[in-house]
Amino acid sequence: MALSDVDVKKQIKHMMAFIEQEANEKAEEIDAKAEEEFNIEKGRLVQTQRLKIMEYYEKKEKQIEQQKKILMSTMRNQARLKVLRARNDLISDLLSEAKLRLSRIVEDPEVYQGLLDKLVLQGLLRLLEPVMIVRCRPQDLLLVEAAVQKAIPEYMTISQKHVEVQIDKEAYLAVNAAGGVEVYSGNQRIKVSNTLESRLDLSAKQKMPEIRMALFGANTNRKFFI
């Protein structure tokens, strides 16, 4: 039986409604999928940026911590150097004061003569040369001549060697020197300095650990002494 125009129109309308519904469902499906993919991508981007921000601030934090350590180390070193300089300055001042006090020794002729006797003999025994020259301050000439005359027989007794000792009357130690003598080999290539200043410096060098211990106490950072 042939369809009437009304039936045809109904079928067409029904088919169009079906197609439209299917199209709408498809569009909704596409929209839902697109939104899902968008949300996934957005989440990925947000997470990526969050990680980048965290990484940036972690790096900054490490840099700040490193700079802090460097600054603290620098400050500790500067403080340590400042303490060392202050300690060295104190020791230098004490040695300078000790050198000034050496002048008191020469004020007593008897004490100074006994000291010169020992310094001259010690200088001769350290060189052990057949010919030696003794140099002194000009104001000590007579005292040193007496010390040399006393030292020669003592030297020969100890060393079992003959010796010729000359006193240098052309070159002297400085007038403002503390005192003592310098002893030279005959060719003046070898010298033993037995001035009061040099003996003080040598004694201070040898006793420096004890001096530092007395002034500043034990060094807790040092595990052993050399």
From Swiss-Prot:
Gene3D superfamilies hit by this protein: 6.10.250.1620, ATP synthase, E subunit, C-terminal (3.30.2320.30)
Superkingdom, taxonomy of origin: Eukaryota
Function comment: Subunit of the V1 complex of vacuolar(H+)-ATPase (V-ATPase), a multisubunit enzyme composed of a peripheral complex (V1) that hydrolyzes ATP and a membrane integral complex (V0) that translocates protons. V-ATPase is responsible for acidifying and maintaining the pH of intracellular compartments and in some cell types, is targeted to the plasma membrane, where it is responsible for acidifying the extracellular environment.
Assembly and oligomerization: V-ATPase is a heteromultimeric enzyme made up of two complexes: the ATP-hydrolytic V1 complex and the proton translocation V0 complex. The V1 complex consists of three catalytic AB heterodimers that form a heterohexamer, three peripheral stalks each consisting of EG heterodimers, one central rotor including subunits D and F, and the regulatory subunits C and H. The proton translocation complex V0 consists of the proton transport subunit a, a ring of proteolipid subunits c9c'', rotary subunit d, subunits e and f, and the accessory subunits ATP6AP1/Ac45 and ATP6AP2/PRR.
Organism: Homo sapiens
One GO term (biological process): regulation of macroautophagy
Protein name per the record: V-type proton ATPase subunit E 2
Family: Belongs to the V-ATPase E subunit family.
GO CC list: acrosomal vesicle; cytosol; proton-transporting two-sector ATPase complex, catalytic domain
